[in-house]
Amino acid sequence: MYHGNAHRRFGRTHEHRKAMFANMCQALIKHEQIVTTLPKAKDLRPVVEKLVTLGKRGDLHARRQAIAQIKDVALVGKLFAVLGPRYKERHGGYTRVLKAGFRYGDNAPMAVIEFVDRDVDAKGKDSGPVFGADQDEAALAS
């Protein structure tokens, strides 16, 4: 029987699931909108909501709890400096999950999870390492 099991396992170990949600939280805080499968988006939502609530609290203990969860100090800074004040007057419901069709390869239901009053310019900003950028900067400087 499947009684008393609160969360989906996604075919992963506990550590793998925890790391996956930490990475997805980082991506959502950085870009303020991500595309993932519908079950992952539904399970990610309470994790992100708790992080935003920590950002609203704003004290040192909340900051340390957020760092323990997502492990990127720069994104924790954004969480406390941008997202916390943005949702100061809102009591929960910081994210929305929108259905986005089905994935081509395996017909998995896809979803978009985003912050409610998101910054449209944050999407795609600093979306990862740019290979060869060091040579371009050196060429421009000389």
Swiss-Prot record:
Q: Which domain of life is it from?
A: Bacteria
Enumerate the Gene Ontology biological process terms: translation
Q: Which UniProt keywords apply?
A: Ribonucleoprotein, Ribosomal protein
| Pfam families found in the cross-reference section | Ribosomal_L17 (PF01196)
**Which GO molecular function entries does the Swiss-Prot or TrEMBL record give?**
structural constituent of ribosome
Q: Which residues form a coiled coil?
A: none
TM region positions: none
Give the matching InterPro entries: Ribosomal_bL17, Ribosomal_bL17_CS, Ribosomal_bL17_sf
Q: Name one GO cellular component term.
A: cytosolic large ribosomal subunit
Q: Which residues form the signal peptide?
A: none
Record-linked PANTHER family: LARGE RIBOSOMAL SUBUNIT PROTEIN BL17M (PTHR14413:SF16), RIBOSOMAL PROTEIN L17 (PTHR14413)
Q: What protein family is recorded?
A: Belongs to the bacterial ribosomal protein bL17 family.
Q: How does it assemble?
A: Part of the 50S ribosomal subunit. Contacts protein L32.
Q: What is this protein called?
A: Large ribosomal subunit protein bL17
Q: Mind giving the lineage of the organism this protein is from?
A: Bacteria, Pseudomonadati, Pseudomonadota, Alphaproteobacteria, Hyphomicrobiales
Record gene name: rplQ
